[in-house]
From Swiss-Prot:
CDD domains: PHD_PHF21B. Residues 79-99, 184-222, 238-277, 295-314, 507-531 are annotated as: Disordered. It comes from Homo sapiens. The gene is PHF21B. Residues 423-465 form a coiled coil. It comes from the Eukaryota. The keyword tRNA processing does not apply. Residues 522-531 have a biased composition (Polar residues). The lineage of its organism: Eukaryota, Metazoa, Chordata, Craniata, Vertebrata. This is PHD finger protein 21B. The keyword Lipid metabolism does not apply. Residues 265-277 have a biased composition (Basic and acidic residues).
């Protein structure tokens, strides 16, 4: 049943869409649109294709959401001369497949109204007729602060070629809806107009009698749920008038007047009254107060002024506390002026002809601050080559260092000097500890080497002891064997003696040589056995 009722409803909607009364009302509205002023008519036409959702009458009958068209929210007031289109209070009767919108934007002579930059928001289209009609009626004021644009939207692509030559804005079809759009004065870019996928822009001059419409792009094919409508924005040209120029000058002069006012405020601002307790506290800590800072700056300027007379001797005009040992060594001219109280640029120094160390002459190196001269070999440490430029002897260097140590330090400089001294002492201590640590490390390495040598010597001694013990045991065994042999020989001699005493005749009858040899042998070997 729904499928059979849908064509009938579609036929009814088409019949309502082609209404003669609506055509008549639109033709009556055209002269009022053509009666716009030249300010609203002159301008350039900008055609920007914008994609927007399209809701057909079938979808509207099915109960789906109403169509939403991107439109500029009215941030300014709507003039009384703008008509309210009657087509806004009735829904469209034909499913739109292509939409065209012609927007005639009016620009105020004020330069603070850019019509190209607008804020775009979604305004419900034909669904909210009472609210849309109530807004223009409530916000009625003369056209003085914002531009006004007319949006002529066509929902019938077949009647898009119908145009009225006698009107200021072309009539697109019978079902054209004329909607006044307000261009806001803020400079926010329209996100939906600029983010369209096909930004085709055409510029052409506008005549008050006709407004040509740009044909739609063939590549912009409609979709079943989204249609493509084209917005033509006419930006009027600003006419230079004496009143507008006079009105536009004060905004440019305001920043300069504001800058002058801030300068006057800074100049007229009284000097800050410092707390006496704060000043006393700063003085007690040695900090620099405002008055002391101004005094230091004035003295510095005076020193700069005086030093420009002779830049070579600018170091002589520095204060005592700013002189360091390095400055003394690097600037010997100052040493002469301070040590001898006789500036070297007034009287030339007559140097000695003999060395101050060995009292001999020839090949002397003169000092730049005193009359003394030295041999290069007599210096400590001795120099191999003569130094270039002005040379300072060790005696003058010691004088300068002693004089620099006696300079009193006051205020903040005393704190800085004490900190520098403390840091120097700590650094020296650190260097001494590092040196002592390196010495101890070297000593430790030497002791380890000595320990290794002693360990090897002890090992050798133990090996020698074991070898000597082995030899001693061998010698003792050999001695035991010799003693046994001696006892055996002595026993044989006693046997021979006893035999001779018992039978002397037979023994003397024959020659006997062996006992004599055996008798002599024990006499020789006996002392060895006792040893």
């Amino acid at each position: 049943m729904e499928l059979q009722s849908r064509p009938e409803a579609l036929a009814v909607e088409l019949a309502r869409h082609q209404n003669g009364d609506l055509k008549k009302q639109l033709h009556e509205r055209q002269p009022r649109i053509a009666a716009l002023s030249d300010k609203q008519a002159l301008g350039t036409i900008t055609a920007v294709p914008v994609t927007g959702p399209q809701v057909s009458s079938l979808q509207r009958l099915a109960g789906q959401g109403a169509a939403v068209l991107p439109q500029v929210r009215p941030k300014t007031l709507i003039p009384d001369s703008l008509p309210v289109a009657p087509g806004r209070d009735r829904p469209p009767k034909q499913p739109p497949t292509f939409q065209k919108a012609t927007v005639v934007s009016v620009k105020n002579p004020s330069p603070a109204l850019p019509t190209a930059n607008n804020t775009v928001s979604h305004v419900p289209a034909p669904g909210s007729q009472p609210q849309a009609l109530a807004e223009p009626a409530a916000l009625a004021s003369p056209l003085s602060s914002a531009g006004v644009a007319y949006a002529i939207i066509s929902t019938s692509p077949s009647n898009a070629a119908a145009m009225a030559p006698s009107t200021a804005v072309s009539v697109v079809s019978d079902s054209i809806k004329v909607q006044p759009l307000l261009i806001s004065a803020d400079n926010k870019p329209p996100p939906r107009l600029l983010s369209s996928p096909h930004p085709a822009t055409h510029h052409c001059p506008l005549h008050p009698s006709s407004l040509p419409l740009t044909p739609p792009s063939p590549s912009l094919s409609p979709s079943p749920l989204h249609g493509i409508f084209q917005v033509i924005i006419i930006q009027p040209q600003v006419q230079t008038q004496p009143e507008s120029t006079a009105e536009s000058r004060p905004p440019t002069e305001e920043p300069s007047q504001g800058a002058q006012a801030t300068k006057k405020k800074k100049e007229d601002r009284p000097p800050t009254q410092e707390n006496p307790e704060k000043i006393a506290f700063m003085v007690a800590l040695g900090l620099v107060t405002t008055e002391h800072l101004e005094e230091i700056q004035s003295k510095r300027q005076e020193r700069k002024r005086r030093s420009t007379a002779n830049p070579a001797y600018s170091g002589l005009l520095e204060t005592e506390r700013k002189r360091l040992a390095s400055n003394y060594l690097n600037n010997p001219l100052f040493l002469t002026a301070r040590a001898n109280e006789d500036p070297c640029w007034k009287n030339e120094i007559t140097h000695d002809e003999h060395c101050a160390a060995c009292k001999r002459g020839a090949n002397l190196q003169p000092c730049g601050t005193c009359p003394g001269a030295y041999h290069l070999s007599c210096l400590e440490p001795p120099l191999k080559t003569a130094p270039k430029g002005v040379w300072v002897c060790p005696r003058c260097q010691q004088k300068a260092l002693k004089k620099d140590e006696g300079v009193p330090w006051t205020g903040m400089l005393a704190i800085v000097h004490s900190y520098v001294t403390h840091k120097t002492v700590k650094e020296e201590e650190k260097q001494k500890l590092l040196q002592r640590g390196s010495e101890l490390q070297n000593e430790h390495q030497q002791l380890e080497e000595r320990d290794r040598r002693l360990a090897s010597a002890v090992q050798k001694c133990l090996e020698l002891k074991t070898s000597l013990l082995a030899r001693q045991r061998g010698t003792q065994s050999s001695l035991d064997r010799l003693r046994a042999l001696l006892r055996l020989i002595q026993g044989e001699q006693l046997l021979q003696v006893t035999m001779t005493t018992t039978s002397p005749a037979p023994l003397l009858a024959g020659p006997w040589t062996k006992p004599s040899v055996a008798a002599t042998h024990p006499t020789v070997q006996h002392p060895q056995g006792h040893n």
